Amino acid sequence: MLADEPSTNAAASEPSVKLAVCVLASGSKGNAIYVSDGQTAILIDAGLSGVEIERRLDSRGLAPDRLQAIVVSHEHADHIGGVGVLSRRYRLPVYLNRKTAGATKRIGRLHRVNTFDCGTVFHVDNLHIHPFSLSHDA
């Protein structure tokens, strides 16, 4: 293709999206995933202690104080263990579905709660999050 010819490659005209995903923990003892587009950083679940999540973020050069939110997938203990502590310590809003919001007594006081409906897209700054339902056994 010559330089002055129009591009027929649709991907060439699409904006470049960079997404960093770091699995901090995955398993029955705790789940936590760091997601960032370079400007907005969130945690999906915080199932370890707040101190352990901070330690794992720090060990990967990720600053806990740069997080903008925690998104909780569901209310099982291995997904919510550090949510309350991190939300209070870093003044992070917590996004959870309505059913999970009913379990916040186990999480403790949260800085700010935002509920979402599965199937409805919501945004945390630049990140577009499309939650959906799955069956999950404990």
Regions found by a protein language model. Name each.
Residues S13, Y34, G61, G84-L86, ...:
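Short secondary-structure boundary/capping segments
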Residues G38-T40, R88-L92, G108-R112:
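Short glycine/proline-enriched coil/turn segments at helix->beta-strand junctions
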Residues V35, D45, H74, V94, ...:
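Divalent metal-coordination and catalytic microenvironments
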Residues M1-R60:
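Conserved beta-strand hairpin/beta-sheet module of binuclear metal-dependent hydrolase folds
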Residues G50-L96, N114:
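Active-site metal-binding motif and surrounding structural segment of the metallo-beta-lactamase
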Residues N97-A138:
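Metallo-beta-lactamase
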Residues S26-S28, L48-G50, H76-A77, L134-A138:
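Short beta->alpha connector loops
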Residues A20-V23, S49, I70-S73, P131-L134:
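Short, flexible loop segments at the rims of nucleotide/cofactor-binding pockets, characterized by
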